[in-house]
Amino acid sequence: MAVKLGTLLLALALGLAQPASARRKLLVFLLDGFRSDYISDEALESLPGFKEIVSRGVKVDYLTPDFPSLSYPNYYTLMTGRHCEVHQMIGNYMWDPTTNKSFDIGVNKDSLMPLWWNGSEPLWVTLTKAKRKVYMYYWPGCEVEILGVRPTYCLEYKNVPTDINFANAVSDALDSFKSGRADLAAIYHERIDVEGHHYGPASPQRKDALKAVDTVLKYMTKWIQERGLQDRLNVIIFSDHGMTDIFWMDKVIELNKYISLNDLQQAKDRGPVVSLWPAPGKHSEIYNKLSTVEHMTVYEKEAIPSRFYYKKGKFVSPLTLVADEGWFITENREMLPFWMNSTGRGNGWQRGWHGYDNELMDMRGIFLAFGPDFKSNFRAAPIRSVDVYNVMCNVVGITPLPNNGSWSRVMCMLKGRAGTTPPVQPSHCALALILLFLLA
């Protein structure tokens, strides 16, 4: 009798410990700057790779990013399920007055400090702590020790990954799954964002970048079959934000026309969202002067709209400037972020940007998924970037940490048992194993 009961308890322990998808692998793609309408039904007709993925899996109408609709804030929102004011990665550029340290879009040495990253635990850290093997390719932050943890493998981002780099990363990730070296692989690709910035979201260059990604994804579905992974691997594709047109010729707000820049202790970023720290005694003067400027809004920290889920962030500045869509804030025109174009000089004008109000249509991103745990040919209602984390946790079979995402917005895309409840608490498994031990 004890043996039979022990066997039943063992089955219970294993069943509770692992949802239906727990032994399956997950391949994640973060395609930077990928606006939702880039894969409209009309556009899909000339994108066979994406079209196949949509027919085999899930496509949401659009994904609303967190505010600000910039890269680093949403990189972390996607991987933690938390708003920026919770995970603390509130911008591409940040400053901490206490330490006088800066985070400058991840390129300066101080950007690697735990100060910026330890505000929340991203999924890859949780999985690594759970003895899962995580492979990351060009993913911003994978080179950082977060809460004392690094992923199993990190191919560090140093320059914009080429199309060949992207294809090689996909192939290597699939080989890692087949050999058992990886449980999660995460691949970051930036070219669509870069071309959208340089030439504009509707440009031939941006469309060519998308076609290059489409070609790799078309091969990927074939490679999955060739490696026999089709029943063991789920694939999720998402973006951090969209892109809109900007017009430097007539839509630039130059701060030096309204205030003295010497009255600022610090200023961070240029574009749709700019952070200002007035010098002592200058706060009211700067606020009053900037309040009259057209095509932007200046917020004192406490007055930032609650819907942005931003103002409680510990790195948020005393004054935050938010531009109207298409407008660009800078100190002066000489400080605009030109790029090195075909002339070989840094004088190229940017034609696209992001970071604006996250509810604007052009800021919307994408979410696609396919694999054994996802419904086929399923169109889902819009979701938000905070929701993606719960989907990933479910399909890898790990309990999500407390987060701001909504399970009700995403459960419809999962099929069978995977779509009924989030992963179970590990305490249930522990209880069953303890009972089994006592009966042994």
UniProtKB/Swiss-Prot annotation:
Q: How is its activity regulated?
A: Inhibited by EDTA and EGTA in vitro.
Enzyme Commission code: 3.1.4.-, 3.1.4.38
Annotated catalysed reactions: sn-glycerol 3-phosphocholine + H2O = phosphocholine + glycerol + H(+); a 1-acyl-sn-glycero-3-phosphocholine + H2O = a 1-acyl-sn-glycerol + phosphocholine + H(+); a 1-O-alkyl-sn-glycero-3-phosphocholine + H2O = a 1-O-alkyl-sn-glycerol + phosphocholine + H(+); 1-dodecanoyl-sn-glycero-3-phosphocholine + H2O = 1-dodecanoyl-sn-glycerol + phosphocholine + H(+)
Give this protein's Gene Ontology molecular function annotations.
Answer: glycerophosphocholine cholinephosphodiesterase activity; glycerophosphodiester phosphodiesterase activity; metal ion binding; phosphoric diester hydrolase activity
PTM Phosphoserine: list the residues.
Answer: 71
Answer yes or no on keyword RNA-binding.
no
This molecule's function is given as:
Choline-specific glycerophosphodiesterase that hydrolyzes glycerophosphocholine (GPC) and lysophosphatidylcholine (LPC) and contributes to supplying choline to the cells. Has a preference for LPC with short (12:0 and 14:0) or polyunsaturated (18:2 and 20:4) fatty acids. In vitro, hydrolyzes only choline-containing lysophospholipids, such as sphingosylphosphorylcholine (SPC), platelet-activating factor (PAF) and lysoPAF, but not other lysophospholipids.
- State the protein's name: Glycerophosphocholine cholinephosphodiesterase ENPP6
Taxonomy of the source species: Eukaryota, Metazoa, Chordata, Craniata, Vertebrata
Q: Which gene encodes it?
A: ENPP6
